[in-house]
UniProtKB/Swiss-Prot annotation:
This is Serine/threonine-protein phosphatase. The lineage of its organism: Viruses, Duplodnaviria, Heunggongvirae, Uroviricota, Caudoviricetes. It comes from Escherichia phage lambda. It is an enzyme of class 3 (hydrolase). Mn(2+) 1 binds at D20, H22, D49. GO terms for biological process: RNA decapping. It comes from the Viruses. It catalyses: O-phospho-L-seryl-[protein] + H2O = L-seryl-[protein] + phosphate; O-phospho-L-threonyl-[protein] + H2O = L-threonyl-[protein] + phosphate. Its cofactor is Mn(2+). Mn(2+) 2 binds at D49, N75, H186. InterPro entries: Ap4A_hydrolase, Calcineurin-like_PHP_ApaH, Metallo-depent_PP-like, Ser/Thr-sp_prot-phosphatase. Keywords: Hydrolase, Manganese, Metal-binding, Protein phosphatase.
Length: 221
């Protein structure tokens, strides 16, 4: 399992971070058209959960093959990887929206298996350095009070933990040291949430069509 990946923002014009897609490929493409995304100059980083619950799961999974797209591993990628492995728990995945895979035709199933294998290479944490700012992108949480690139982490905490956001919503807000901004998904909300230097950008695209993109580099950031 890959834990950390570092991205040098100077290689790109504009950079956006997108919330949980959950198979909402057309919604994303429409958003990218609206913002004038240029796949030769710009970069899109996903907070994970590309698949499950929505209708266009293979299309969303295929995004990880494109050079203009990066993603961290979400709990739904992990359930897919585990469910398709020999020792995996397929029922856990099915209960959480994985049924789409078992309704694919033969060709799409072969493609989805290959993409799931590639998804097993996704990092848990992306560090983006953009000019003088450091952004850390994880699916659910960075489970420490201070960030350090390469620090050992419990992968289950990174992709599942809701303790920090729960505390923040109850008024117990703590900054995470070591980076300027932390961007998470995983916990759906009506609008993006911000507590101290943490942003939560899962706005329930698969439930209500509201997909959030946050620009972190370029004009408008």
């Amino acid at each position: 399992m890959r834990y950390y990946e570092k991205i040098d923002g100077s290689k790109y014009r504009n950079i956006w971070v997108v919330g949980d897609l959950h198979g909402c490929y057309t919604n994303l493409m429409n958003k990218l058209d609206t913002i004038g995304f240029d796949n030769k100059k710009d970069l899109l980083i996903s907070v994970g959960d590309l698949v499950d619950r929505g209708a266009e799961n293979v299309e969303c999974l295929e995004l990880i093959t494109f050079p203009w797209f990066r993603a961290v591993r979400g709990n739904h990628e992990q359930m897919m990887i585990d469910g398709l492995s020999e020792r995996g728990n397929v029922n856990h995945w099915l209960l959480n929206g994985g049924g789409w895979f078992f309704n694919l035709d033969y060709d799409k199933e072969i493609l989805a298996k290959a993409l799931a294998h590639k998804a097993d290479e996704l990092p848990l944490i992306i560090e983006l350095v953009s000019k003088d700012k450091k952004y850390v992108i994880c699916h659910a949480d960075y489970p420490f009070d201070e960030y350090e690139f390469g620090k050992p982490v419990d992968h289950q905490q990174v992709i599942w933990n809701r303790e920090r956001i729960s505390n923040s919503q109850n008024g117990i807000v703590k900054e995470i040291k070591g980076a300027d901004t932390f961007i998470f998904g995983h916990t759906p909300a009506v609008k993006p949430l911000k507590f101290a230097n943490q942003m939560y950008i899962d706005t329930g695209a698969v439930f209500c069509g509201n997909l959030t993109l946050i620009q972190v580099q370029g004009e408008g950031a």
